[in-house]
A protein has these predicted regions:
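Structural signature of hydrophobic alpha-helical transmembrane segments
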Residues: 2-18, 67-77, 129-143
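Hydrophobic alpha-helical transmembrane segments in multi-pass integral membrane proteins
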Residues: 49-55, 112-124, 171-185
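C-terminal ends of transmembrane helices
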Residues: 21-34, 82-95, 144-160
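Hydrophobic/small/kink-forming positions within alpha-helical transmembrane segments
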Residues: 14, 44, 48-52, 56, ...
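Short helical (or helix-break) motifs at transmembrane helix termini and adjacent helical loops
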Residues: 13-24, 84-87, 113-118
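Alpha-helical multi-pass membrane helix bundles of inner-membrane/thylakoid proteins
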Residues: 67, 82-110
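Juxtamembrane transmembrane-helix termini in multi-pass membrane transport proteins
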Residues: 3-59, 123
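Selective transmembrane alpha-helices of multi-pass membrane proteins
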Residues: 9, 63-89, 158-185
Length: 185
């Protein structure tokens, strides 16, 4: 596998985290560099961790994750998306400025489950996992931080409709993940 191939894989894996980061930026009252960094570290960290786990533990958990991973991602993203849509009708006092571990952990897990499967395939190809997972993590970190700022630019002017769209996007990502996992897509 070439470096170019790996970069394309990293960008592809980071798209869900990028979309969720945009949603976080949309729904925050005031976005700072700290918020962008938090999203980048959480999503980039999990996008680094999951391929490594898939590489080392894939034989033991691949079947289980293949069976339940899409459902887990769907439920987490659908619940968070529905909550965003609901909160968008509540006014500014309902804005989501929560970048705590409790808020970020389910998002990081939901957006990185597919990276576990990539790690399993990397093991089958006998790739050197640390540089590969590192590149995936760094690209996801950067794109996620950018996503928060992009979301904030639109959120300031179009907060309620943008938050509704963000919630719908999260639900659609969950549905896509589920349908892909079930072999429909």
């Amino acid at each position: 596998m070439t470096l170019f191939d790996l970069i394309l894989i990293a960008i592809s894996l980071s798209m869900d985290a990028f979309a969720v980061s945009i949603c976080k930026g949309l729904s925050a009252r005031k976005v700072s560099l700290q918020h962008a960094t938090i999203c980048g570290v959480w999503f980039g960290g999990f996008q680094f961790l999951m391929p490594a786990l898939g590489y080392f533990l894939g034989d033991r958990f691949a079947a289980l994750l293949t069976k339940f991973g899409p459902w887990i991602a769907f439920v987490l993203l659908a619940l968070i998306g529905a909550s965003m849509i609901k909160e968008s009708f509540g006014g500014d006092e309902q804005l989501d400025d929560d970048y705590s571990a409790k808020a970020m952990l389910p998002l990081a897990i939901a957006t990185s489950i597919d990276a576990f499967a990539v790690g399993v395939s990397f093991a089958a190809m006998q790739m050197d996992i640390l540089p590969a997972a590192g590149l995936i993590g760094v690209i996801t970190c950067l794109l996620s931080a950018i996503g928060v700022k992009v979301g904030a630019m639109f959120g300031d002017k179009y907060r309620a409709p943008a938050e509704r769209i963000g919630g719908i996007v999260l639900i659609l990502i969950g549905v896509k993940t589920l349908l892909t996992g079930l072999g429909v897509l």
